[in-house]
């Protein structure tokens, strides 16, 4: 697969994630869009690591680190969303006024 194809796919994923994050009114959807953005970045890390220097695995290792951070972020984000849902009975971002009290 060519470098340009992977970069275009990564740009599409990143754009979809940014668009979804900006227009999302649901917290779960916002978390999913954030995961799309992180996966697009991981694709770039692995692609550039493979394309420019095949012997060193810096991009691959950093990508694994980002995946671990994304998994922790998803777990903590899901816990926060479920806690907000239990208290407010809604996961809509514009209805959540936790910081105004």
Curated annotation (Swiss-Prot):
The keyword Cell cycle does not apply. GO terms for biological process: ATP synthesis coupled electron transport; photosynthesis, light reaction. It comes from the Eukaryota. The keyword Zinc-finger does not apply. Pfam families: Oxidored_q2 (PF00420). NDH is composed of at least 16 different subunits, 5 of which are encoded in the nucleus. It comes from Carica papaya (Papaya). Gene3D superfamilies: 1.10.287.3510. Its EC number is 7.1.1.-. It is a multi-pass membrane protein. Its main location: plastid. It is an enzyme of class 7 (translocase). This is NAD(P)H-quinone oxidoreductase subunit 4L, chloroplastic. GO terms for cellular component: chloroplast thylakoid membrane; NADH dehydrogenase complex.
